[in-house]
């Protein structure tokens, strides 16, 4: 499904060059749930952002179903990102003035799909993540765990092939974080959606199909 080859990423810093990814190679199979672990600064989030086309590599390639995603135009990348990749971040990034249902619908609305077409899908997803009774609550009326469940529902609305989750439990207490991870594991199995999750939590990463260890910009 995804092949990362000889990936490097460098940034200019104070007249010098900081290299945060150093020749990364990685294969991700369809339907896997992969945990990426490592110390802060190891390059985990940078790798995730490049796979999701939120950033570009300095050198190297990322192939998605055989296609080099960085040969796409910016517009094609944006469409690819919206249709085929879902994102969950440490902070939920929900729009505070909109309800849980409206937030979950947002990726499809960006694609100019009609609300009456997508609301049943969004309601079903929110029910699937345990929020059937919270559809019309705004983010400020939801707990941290509930906010992240809305974010997961939003990530899945377009039926993406891949969900990229960057420390999705980082702002949650232990019990809530474990429940969220268990929910993503269930969705992975039930839907066959590929999940790549960055986490510092060893207990959670142990539940993944595969653990990818990163250190100093490399997979070790």
Can you describe what each PLM-predicted range is?
Residues 2-214:
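ABC family nucleotide-binding domain
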